[in-house]
Design a protein with these regions (language model features):
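Chalcogenol-based redox active-site neighborhoods
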Residues: 1-166
Length: 166
């Protein structure tokens, strides 16, 4: 796995590596798996929790940009350890347009290297690191952002997609 920390202004494009296999429940109904997305580009943006200020901002920004992702032929999915019940309330409250995947056991989050120790007010706990992955139509991760700062992030993902798909 190519794990890197992406800071503002750095190149998120990585040496391609295989997206881990997954099969997760989707807020849109049914399950979404790596196999079901074969032949399609997709973006997975991982965030710590529904209904928290920064995660809400990030989800709303990705949702507003969904038509731009669709115009590029790219599927967009939010991913957190929240269950489908939490996702349904979150989607309804903010009018989110993209599906959210529920990784309650953090299997994919961990496989992507985005589950780890965090600290809040001196208290240590395990949680999801905000990160984003661009997966191509062959199932390879072509770009990744780690420890994401939300300001300007959606635009950076779209810019990278334009470059990769050119």
């Amino acid at each position: 796995m190519a794990v890197s920390s992406q800071k503002a202004g750095t190149n998120p494009v990585v040496t391609p590596w295989p997206c881990p296999a997954f099969d997760l429940p989707s807020s849109a109904g049914g399950h979404v798996s790596k196999d079901s997305l074969k032949g399609q580009w997709f973006v997975l943006f991982l965030y710590p929790a529904d209904n928290t200020p920064t995660c809400t901002q990030e989800n709303c920004e990705f949702s507003a940009a969904l038509p731009q992702f669709e115009a590029l032929g790219v599927k967009l999915f939010g991913l957190s350890k929240n269950d489908l019940n939490d996702h349904a309330k979150f989607i309804h409250k903010y009018g989110l347009k993209m599906p959210l995947l529920a990784d309650e056991m953090t299997v994919l989050i961990d496989a992507l290297g985005s589950w780890g120790e965090k600290s809040l007010y001196g208290r240590k706990y395990m949680g999801t690191d905000r990160s984003t992955f661009v997966v191509d139509d062959t199932g390879l991760i072509r770009a990744e952002w780690r420890k994401v700062r939300t300001k300007g992030h959606v635009e950076a993902v779209l810019k990278t997609l334009h470059q990769l798909k050119a």
